[in-house]
Amino acid sequence: MFEVEVLNEAEFEIDEARLKMAALTVLARLRAQDEGEMTVAITDNDAVADLNRRFRGVDAPTDVLSFPMDSMPGDVPYLGDLVIAYPYAKAQAEREGHGLSDSLALLVVHGTLHLLGYDHDTPERKAEMWAAQESALIALDVPIEIVPALEDGVHDEPQG
């Protein structure tokens, strides 16, 4: 069984079950992993800006950061961590006219794909990632129109 832990670091208003389902939907649709763990941390802009500065050299908050992990042999496979800046995501949802729950689900789907090795650094890889993302969003009843909001953010996985 795959476990998704959601850490709501400031008791933001979130639908924890929907966030877990977003990650599990990606894993199921891609038949990626049947067993393992990952964490989704919902935090503030300052915490994400600090991580963005330390791991990407970008001195600004962003919507979501992905930190893939390598598991030790014999351990339960650990996919990695997602860190979402709730205030940033909320402002982005309001600016784009999307529901916050849908926006957070999109960020979990997008971040989980990064944990699985997907990226959008070339047109070909972006097309592959966006197709997988769209498939998961449709399964979650998230409107596809929400995806262009990602074009404005800087949310690639950190290096290092």
Language-model features: locations:
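Beta-strand elements within well-structured catalytic alpha/beta cores of enzymes
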Residues: 104-108
